[in-house]
């Protein structure tokens, strides 16, 4: 729990920092400090190993630029030396004018692009320090210095918590269809595609590198000997990310997971003309959740044989072209791809050049706040599609912030996918039965529909009973002191409670996970009740208005 408490404490400090205002800022600024502490621990670990073998070791960061020198000088008792440790304006000035320029130079001085040193230069070339207060910066440094990355347990806990911060960032960044891909879904996709040592794994829209990190976790269990490990480290994972912050996070995320020098580059995948892709460029495995609904310049659209304005459809063409013959892919995409008329040519291309063997239909709520339904396409290149196995995921509950998708939800899919078994949730479609537009819509022929034997009159009575019960329950829950004029005006806006009310004076991020879930559940219940209240207020108000109008007519009649 040390990492969770530290991350929460750092977020609280950053909330008071003028240069940071969003979850994206919190993650970015925490990341570069965490990264430098990680490098210091890595240097110490390598120094010990070198000393035990009698070898010389040159640390990655040298002299005063080491974390242990500028950030956390220690007393003889092992505590931070408050006398010699910089703080305030001196610390902020050192970071901006000396540390960052020093780190950016690594891109020029590294022996090759395939080194950790080069990646350090790349990362800090994209970064700037947004923590303008040197006092806030000192507080954060002291918190991070308490963390350690020596043991496997330490590293695992850190990556788990780092992923949770990435999740917050992903759900805060909603431009151009960018959403955080739930890790249980990624792990399931990786298991189905089953990448092997010696195969290349590619994500051309890698975001925070979730697919690449999970593929690494999966494949490292297959490592036998130093040659396999070298292959996994240097010649396996490839990613491209267009935007600077996700690129930085992706690179750090892979390093934290254990890939020393990730092959992730910053660039626009869609700027690559399909006609320029050579056999040597192609990859054996593609795992991706491409952005949807974004926009590209006209010259970028010209790189694709099938004309489209939808970025996800451009990426689909790229995937098909980039796969080696015999290569495998697992792709998350909006379910409208299956049926939209403007995607029919692309569906036909996919079915002709690849074996689209599996479509996993995901329920709403998998991507929090996205408001779209998605599917996962599993296909192999080199053989045309003859049959498609569908699986309609039904977790038996509404997915959301407090009811996220889990690996248990996907267990039945994984089990049945091995044999393409038919069930209430799965079925097979023969491609020869498809129409000219190759409509791949999810139409479950095996779903058991409960037949309602009630008469129309009985159904109407049930609806009336439900409306009356709901209205009574809501009125019981309402307290009229939430409205002005002692509850006389039911249709006025609620009066906000004072900010200093005791039960509102708390820090959400400081709560335990259990309490957070309780708060989230209460928020959802309140939101649902407010929605119901709005639904019943309108007809009630209309009835009252009608009665008041009749009342006014009677008064006017008597005045005459």
Question: Residue spans of the language-model regions?
Answer:
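Conserved, well-folded catalytic cores of nucleic-acid-processing
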Residues: 13, 147, 164, 168, ...
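Conserved S-adenosyl-L-methionine
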Residues: 176-288, 293-295, 300, 307-309, ...
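A generic structural signal for well-ordered coil/turn residues at beta-strand boundaries
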Residues: 23, 282, 286, 372-373, ...
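Non-catalytic, mostly N-terminal accessory regions of nucleic-acid modification and defense proteins
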Residues: 1-197, 265-272, 277, 361-364, ...
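Conserved Class I SAM-dependent methyltransferase catalytic core
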Residues: 22, 244-247, 308-379
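Conserved nucleotide-binding/hydrolysis micro-motifs of P-loop NTPases
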Residues: 41, 244-245, 270-271, 291-294, ...
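Conserved P-loop NTPase
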Residues: 376, 380-412
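Hydrophobic alpha-helix feature that most strongly marks membrane-spanning transmembrane helices
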Residues: 220, 255, 291, 321-324, ...
């Amino acid at each position: 729990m040390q990492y969770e408490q530290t991350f929460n404490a750092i977020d609280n400090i950053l909330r008071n920092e003028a240069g940071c205002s969003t979850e994206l800022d919190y993650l970015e600024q925490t990341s570069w400090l965490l990264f430098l502490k990680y490098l210091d621990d890595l240097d110490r670990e390598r120094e010990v190993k070198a000393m035990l073998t009698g070898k010389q070791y040159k640390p990655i960061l040298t002299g005063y630029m080491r974390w242990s020198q500028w950030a956390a000088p220690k007393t003889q008792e092992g505590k931070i030396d408050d006398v010699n440790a910089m703080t305030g304006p001196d610390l902020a000035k050192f970071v901006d004018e000396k540390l960052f320029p020093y780190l950016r130079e690594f891109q020029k001085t590294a022996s090759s692009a395939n080194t950790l040193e080069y990646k350090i230069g790349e990362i800090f070339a994209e970064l700037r320090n947004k923590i303008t207060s040197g006092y806030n910066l000192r507080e954060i440094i002291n918190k991070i210095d308490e963390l350690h990355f020596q043991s496997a347990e330490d590293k695992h806990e850190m990556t788990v918590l780092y992923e949770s911060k990435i999740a917050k960032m992903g759900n805060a960044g909603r431009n151009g269809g960018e959403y955080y891909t739930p890790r249980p879904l990624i792990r399931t996709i990786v298991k189905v595609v089953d990448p092997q040592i010696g195969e290349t794994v590619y994500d051309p829209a890698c975001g925070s590198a979730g697919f690449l990190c999970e593929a690494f976790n999966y494949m490292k269990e297959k490592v036998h000997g130093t040659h396999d490990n070298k292959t996994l480290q240097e010649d396996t994972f490839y990613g491209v990310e267009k935007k600077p912050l996700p690129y930085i996070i992706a690179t750090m995320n892979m390093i934290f997971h254990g890939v020393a020098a990730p092959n992730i580059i910053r660039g626009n995948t869609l700027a690559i003309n399909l006609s320029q892709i050579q056999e040597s460029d192609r990859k054996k495995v593609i795992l991706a959740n491409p952005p949807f609904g974004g926009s590209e310049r006209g010259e970028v659209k010209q790189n694709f044989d099938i004309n489209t304005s939808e970025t996800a459809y451009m990426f689909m063409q790229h995937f098909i072209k980039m796969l080696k013959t015999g290569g495998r892919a697992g792709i998350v995409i909006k379910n409208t791809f299956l049926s939209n008329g403007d995607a029919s040519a692309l569906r036909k291309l996919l079915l002709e050049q690849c074996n689209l063997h599996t479509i996993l239909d995901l329920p709403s709520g998998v991507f929090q706040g996205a408001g779209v339904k998605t599917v996962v396409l599993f296909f192999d290149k080199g053989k045309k599609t003859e049959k498609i196995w569908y699986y309609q995921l039904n977790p038996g509950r509404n997915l959301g912030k407090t009811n996220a998708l889990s690996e248990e939800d996907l267990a039945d899919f994984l089990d049945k996918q091995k044999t393409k078994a038919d069930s209430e949730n799965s079925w097979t479609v023969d491609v020869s039965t498809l129409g000219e537009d190759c409509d791949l819509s999810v139409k479950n022929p095996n779903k058991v529909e409960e037949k309602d034997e009630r008469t129309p009159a009985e159904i109407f009575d049930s609806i009336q009973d439900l409306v009356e019960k709901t209205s009574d329950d809501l009125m019981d829950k309402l307290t009229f002191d939430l409205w002005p004029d002692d509850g006389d005006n039911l249709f006025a806006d609620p009066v906000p409670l004072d900010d200093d009310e005791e039960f509102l004076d708390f820090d959400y991020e400081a709560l335990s996970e259990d309490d957070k879930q309780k708060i989230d559940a209460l928020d959802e219940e309140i939101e649902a009740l407010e929605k119901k209240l709005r639904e019943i207020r309108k007809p009630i108000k209309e009835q009252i208005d009608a009665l008041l109008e009749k009342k006014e007519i009677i008064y006017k009649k008597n005045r005459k």
